Swiss-Prot record:
HAMAP family: Get1 (MF_03113). It is a multi-pass membrane protein. The chain crosses the membrane at residues 11-30, 115-135, 160-176. InterPro entries: Get1, Get1_fungi, Helix_hairpin_bin_sf. The gene is GET1. Residues 76-114 form a coiled coil. The keyword Coiled coil applies. This is Golgi to ER traffic protein 1. It comes from the Eukaryota.
Length: 196
């Protein structure tokens, strides 16, 4: 076998991958995609994005000037600013269409990256390490039928394989993350029975 890893290496790496997968699931793919997009906006060499940001700042300044003067008292200046604002708005809309295509490709790239980091390693491990004994239980710790279930699908009684380890680790990680995140969730008000 070309991937001859120690069983404890497999245990720890699968645990870390499952932990990352649960954290990604808790945060949400859309939140991660939005973070990647904002990061891309900051570091991108794309000229359309730079123009978009510059024009947004210009539009903000023009609108600020428009609000500071009276349309009745300084009509010519207000009209000139209004034309500039309309022109900038149309340019911003054109740039926004270009940027939307970039956002779609960045979102797709983020999805692929998340899949490569969380889902693909699990499937690779299931294929290559499905017959690897990860650890052994001493005989008599559990009743015989529980040892048999823990040895599923390919192992002699008393051995624990990847399938059972992944199931157990995923359950524990999910429960711990749920307990930790519960403390930060919005409080739910006690329901009050309505009188008839």
């Amino acid at each position: 076998m070309f991937l001859d890893l120690h069983p404890y290496t497999i245990l720890v790496s699968i645990f870390i991958i499952l932990l990352v997968k649960q954290i990604v699931g808790r945060i949400g793919k859309s939140t991660i995609q939005e973070f990647v997009w904002l990061l891309y906006l900051k570091i991108s060499p794309n000229q359309a994005i730079k123009d978009y940001n510059t024009k947004k700042v210009e539009l903000h300044e023009i609108n600020k000037q428009k609000r500071s003067i009276s349309a009745q008292d300084e009509y010519a200046k207000w009209t000139k600013l209004n034309r500039q604002a309309d022109k900038l708005t149309s340019e911003i809309q054109k740039l926004n269409e270009e940027i939307r295509q970039s956002k779609a490709s960045i979102d797709k790239l983020a999805n692929v990256l998340l899949m490569v980091l969380t889902t693909l390693p699990i499937w690779v491990a299931r294929i290559f390490f499905r017959k690897t004994h990860l650890f052994y239980l001493r005989s008599g710790i559990f009743p015989r039928y529980i040892e048999w279930v823990l040895a599923l699908p390919f192992f002699p009684s008393g051995a624990v394989g990847l399938t059972v380890w992944m199931f157990a680790a995923n359950s524990v990680i999910h429960n711990v993350i749920s307990l930790v995140s519960f403390a930060f969730e919005k409080r739910v008000e006690k329901p009050v029975r309505q009188k008839k």
